[in-house]
Amino acid sequence: MQFSIIAISFLASLAMASPAKRGGGGGGSGSGSGSGSGSGSGGGSTTYTACSSTLYSEAQCCATDVLGVADLDCETVPETPTSASSFESICATSGRDAKCCTIPLLGQALLCQDPVGL
């Protein structure tokens, strides 16, 4: 029992220590000067990454949340979310909450957190 408490505490501290990655979109324009001129634009698109943490890397739809840490009866997200609101609505169709979890074991995602943007 003490080992599991220590293990969960250790994993939780790792999760808090890892920085969240946030994607940035590219954009810009340019013009040339001198004898010639030119223009350009960078139309980069921002890809939504719901679970950017190394530890909490699994996007899951979970039915039961225990104290905001452990989640039970989780399923893999059936489609790729394009935003935080789409992730939330995908899970809501089955009456579940959008979560980012550690690798689940037998449907029990023991450590979970809210995805980026929620």
From Swiss-Prot:
<feature type="compositionally biased region" description="Gly residues">
    <location>
        <begin position="22"/>
        <end position="45"/>
    </location>
</feature>
<comment type="function">
    <text>Aerial growth, conidiation, and dispersal of filamentous fungi in the environment rely upon a capability of their secreting small amphipathic proteins called hydrophobins (HPBs) with low sequence identity. Class I can self-assemble into an outermost layer of rodlet bundles on aerial cell surfaces, conferring cellular hydrophobicity that supports fungal growth, development and dispersal; whereas Class II form highly ordered films at water-air interfaces through intermolecular interactions but contribute nothing to the rodlet structure.</text>
</comment>
<keyword id="KW-0732">Signal</keyword>
<feature type="repeat" description="3">
    <location>
        <begin position="33"/>
        <end position="34"/>
    </location>
</feature>
<feature type="disulfide bond">
    <location>
        <begin position="61"/>
        <end position="91"/>
    </location>
</feature>
<feature type="disulfide bond">
    <location>
        <begin position="51"/>
        <end position="100"/>
    </location>
</feature>
<feature type="signal peptide">
    <location>
        <begin position="1"/>
        <end position="22"/>
    </location>
</feature>
<keyword id="KW-1015">Disulfide bond</keyword>
<dbReference type="Pfam" id="PF06766">
    <property type="entry name" value="Hydrophobin_2"/>
</dbReference>
<dbReference type="GO" id="GO:0005576">
    <property type="term" value="C:extracellular region"/>
</dbReference>
<feature type="repeat" description="1">
    <location>
        <begin position="29"/>
        <end position="30"/>
    </location>
</feature>
<feature type="disulfide bond">
    <location>
        <begin position="101"/>
        <end position="112"/>
    </location>
</feature>
<feature type="disulfide bond">
    <location>
        <begin position="62"/>
        <end position="74"/>
    </location>
</feature>
<dbReference type="InterPro" id="IPR010636">
    <property type="entry name" value="Cerato-ulmin_hydrophobin"/>
</dbReference>
<feature type="region of interest" description="7 X 2 AA tandem repeats of S-G">
    <location>
        <begin position="29"/>
        <end position="42"/>
    </location>
</feature>
<protein>
    <recommendedName>
        <fullName>Class II hydrophobin CRP</fullName>
    </recommendedName>
</protein>
<keyword id="KW-0677">Repeat</keyword>
<feature type="region of interest" description="Disordered">
    <location>
        <begin position="20"/>
        <end position="46"/>
    </location>
</feature>
<comment type="similarity">
    <text>Belongs to the cerato-ulmin hydrophobin family.</text>
</comment>
<keyword id="KW-0964">Secreted</keyword>
<comment type="subunit">
    <text>Homotetramer. Further self-assembles to form highly ordered films at water-air interfaces through intermolecular interactions.</text>
</comment>
<feature type="repeat" description="2">
    <location>
        <begin position="31"/>
        <end position="32"/>
    </location>
</feature>
<keyword id="KW-0134">Cell wall</keyword>
<feature type="repeat" description="4">
    <location>
        <begin position="35"/>
        <end position="36"/>
    </location>
</feature>
<dbReference type="InterPro" id="IPR036686">
    <property type="entry name" value="Hydrophobin_sf"/>
</dbReference>
<feature type="repeat" description="7">
    <location>
        <begin position="41"/>
        <end position="42"/>
    </location>
</feature>
<feature type="repeat" description="6">
    <location>
        <begin position="39"/>
        <end position="40"/>
    </location>
</feature>
<feature type="repeat" description="5">
    <location>
        <begin position="37"/>
        <end position="38"/>
    </location>
</feature>
